[in-house]
Amino acid sequence: MTNYAFKFGYEGSYFTGFQRGNGDHSVEDTIIDTLKASGFDYAIKAAARTDRYVSALSNVFSLETGRSPEAVAGLINSRIDHIYVHSYAEVPDDFNPRHCTFKTYRYYILRQDLDCISLDINLGKFIGTHDFRRFVRADSRNTVRTIINASCKNDNGLLYLEFSARSFLWNQIRTMVAFILDNIGVETDPFSTSERYPRVARAQNLLLWDIYYDGIEFRKVKKIPKKMQGVYENSIMNYILAENLMHRFGIA
């Protein structure tokens, strides 16, 4: 038996969230049930448990198997719609995908009246180590986190906010985004009070972009054409665009 980590993407609207037991069609349930139905009776460990409607380009799960990683990836890619395994790495037996170097999320903003200059006024204040209890749901866990990157980027007219950290709290990114969008052009200290911020930005715009591990090199799955990742990435972006258009015109 060899331990492997797999990078995979999915479109959030087709699932009831990530975590097993979260509704009748979670990402984790779908993967495990598909593997079991094909004789792969393995438990998986996942790096990030994204909320409902949140998509991923590169989440990570690991499992121990006597089969080849290409066989595992091929099974998932051929039998599950809207989930795509695109790379893998052999990892130590004690590997835990949650113990990453850092995760990167992108939150896409479809508003033509905004630019990165106006968004950067408060965005950079989240960088560093802070107590984020104001930006999470009620939780007894330690709410101190270290943000290593919080930046705004413009990709051919499509704005997105990018956040990187070793770990994030539940709804932390979406609540920070709501704060930023509510204070455009107004310099405000996000940590001036501990009172919980009342608004959370829409989940449909959030994308888990990638997860990084020191010393682990992932290989592309060979049996899938290289162009498929680009096609899949485009499908996620089209999904984000469509969801925002429907929301804007009151369809969803």
Curated annotation (Swiss-Prot):
Key words of the record: Isomerase, tRNA processing
Task: State its Enzyme Commission number(s).
Answer: 5.4.99.12
Q: Which residues form the active site?
A: 51
Catalytic activity, reaction form: uridine(38/39/40) in tRNA = pseudouridine(38/39/40) in tRNA
Q: Does the keyword Isomerase apply?
A: yes
Q: Where does substrate bind?
A: 105
Return one GO MF term.
Answer: tRNA pseudouridine(38-40) synthase activity
GO BP field: tRNA pseudouridine synthesis
User: What stretch or stretches form a coiled coil here?
Assistant: none
Asked if the Swiss-Prot or TrEMBL record annotates the protein with the keyword Isomerase, the reply is yes
Family to which the UniProt record says this protein belongs: Belongs to the tRNA pseudouridine synthase TruA family.
Function (record text) = Formation of pseudouridine at positions 38, 39 and 40 in the anticodon stem and loop of transfer RNAs.
Q: What is this protein called in UniProt? A: tRNA pseudouridine synthase A
Q: What species does this protein belong to?
A: Thermoplasma acidophilum (strain ATCC 25905 / DSM 1728 / JCM 9062 / NBRC 15155 / AMRC-C165)
Traced from the root, the source organism's taxonomic lineage reads:
Archaea, Methanobacteriati, Thermoplasmatota, Thermoplasmata, Thermoplasmatales
